[in-house]
Amino acid sequence: MAVRLSKCLLLASIALLYTLIVFNNTTDYNTNYQFVRHVLQMDTTLPGNHGLWRAIHSPAIHIVFYLFIILWEAVTAVLCWWATLRMLRALSATAANFDHAKQLGIAALTLGMLLWFGAFIVIGGEWFLMWQSHLWNGQGAALNNFAILGIVLLYLNLPDTATAR
């Protein structure tokens, strides 16, 4: 039961994290929008950069990117909360039923990992060369979040071997 509860609490912590991220991105919209804008414009990358042809200068596209990120984070938060509730309801269930209840959490964590790795590290970091910016480099934060979600995903994905008590 302790392992099951541990998995629920860790997933709830991820849900809270995403809830706070969405809260911060909406209540401090401009600060976080500036991050997205500068990454897409590539205006703080290294001088002489030959990849600047990739830069996007359209404010409308910057807004679409940013709103898409917020939406992705909000969906991840909702799915994590929903999965946490499903798992809590299955705390006393059979191992098979508890494992089944974890599936939505596995999907939610995967969705979160795709944002940090796919959007921030791959697209932001490599396509828009975010790693070259001293001011707008979010690669470290993205890697931290990707790693945290990955560890929780691995732990959550372990099969439940305890019998219900």
Predicted regions and their residues:
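Helix-to-loop transition at the C-terminal end of transmembrane segments
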Residues: 23-31
